[in-house]
Amino acid sequence: RVLPFYNHPGARGEDSILSTCLTDYTVKRIPVYTFHDGFGFYGSLLKGVLPLSLKKISLYDSALITDRFYRACLGWVRYKPLYTYLTQPEEYDRIMEESKERLEKSLPKVCAYFNRSEFRNLSEELQFYEKNVQSHYKEFRDAQRVWKKAVEKTVADGLVPQNPGSA
């Protein structure tokens, strides 16, 4: 019942990649409040205390914020080719061309806004991961096969019950 959590090298989006495997599963929405403290501003969360108000985050206040945003962007452009290949294979070439064009148009503005030239690397990263999408796809499928064998062996060896709710 548990599926492998695959992430190709240096990319983000492992939850999105996992979602492509859920077609034959019942996915339940559980209404819970979650809070992602991406910058470590709310230490009280670890004690179970939620903030009453949120701090305003300015892109100009901290290189940490800009660095984190840059790394997130890198992760996004790295996972886009594989995610698109998995979810829209018939439209893959068109979507990737459109994405590259839009990225090329927007990067000069992004670099100027953040006053950081390294955002230009996003275009090269997208092209690299697009070029390697077949390899990443094969790794993803290999991970699924290996995981399936491991689960089958674990069940066959009696290490876990075959129907987890029935024990």
Regions found by a protein language model. Name each.
Residues 7-9:
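Conserved ATP-binding loop and adjacent catalytic segment of the adenylate-forming AMP-binding
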Residues 39:
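Conserved catalytic loop of SAM-dependent methyltransferase domains
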Residues 19, 42-46:
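Eukaryote-biased recognition of electropositive, low-complexity segments
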Residues 20-36:
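Catalytic donor-sugar/metal-binding loop of nucleotide-sugar-dependent glycosyltransferases
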Residues 30, 45-48:
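Generic alpha-helical propensity signal that fires on short helical segments
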Residues 1-5:
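Conserved nucleotide-sugar donor-binding
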Residues 11-17:
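Acidic donor-binding loop at a coil-to-helix junction in glycosyltransferase catalytic cores
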Residues 50-167:
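Terminal low-complexity segments of carbohydrate-biosynthetic enzymes
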